[in-house]
Amino acid sequence: SNNNIIESPFYQRKEVVDRYNGLILNCGKEFELEFRAYDEGMAYRFISKYEGTYKIINEQADFRFDRDYRSHLAYAPRGGADGNDRFNSSFEEMYTETSLSGIAENQLIMTPTLIVGNEGKKLCIAESDVISYPGMFLTRTEDYSNVLSGTYASYPEKMAPRSWNDSFYKMENYADYIAKCDGVRTFPWRILCIADNDIELLSNDMVYRLASPSRIADTAWIKPGLATWDYWNNWEGQGESGKT
């Protein structure tokens, strides 16, 4: 069990209560599977114990539902195309409401994705602590109408300059794996946030709590003020700023 306070001076509240029950399953010499159960949901992640270099061919994350629930989701703008270009997105799409069976087959869905269950209870599929690893999209296949499966872009092997309005670099060649790793590490959290109503979703801190702690030891120099498109101006994918 864990019951700590996370200092969060730059979050929507000054402190966040981090209370959960945890379990780590030892799956042999090379990896572990960690679970955490919160009052507001649950999460799991893989932990690698392998000390050499290795590649992640794929990750299977299936979210299976017992019936055809309603969902609120956003399709990736190129999500119906073939190949890895379909993952190229500015993440600015509108959400739509549909049943699970009404989701377009093999169309990429962005996360977070919201499922409306019995008595209006909400279940939100999300992720956290995505470092040097592709973000998770979701897809529904024809054979499994009530199942949403994690889908990931392949690792980019070659990039070339491209116009500013899409990306500074275009991926020209992709590998047959999704990530390259070196040594012991943790992988992204797969999260299920649970709420009785929409209001509770707004105060759910699971994504924040499951993220890695700040790497900046001294934050006293950070002052309130205005910033201009820091996410845009640092996106060229080169150097340390493009590590993720």
Residue ranges and their predicted role:
Residues 1-203:
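N-terminal accessory beta-strand-rich subdomains and adjacent acidic, glycine-rich linkers
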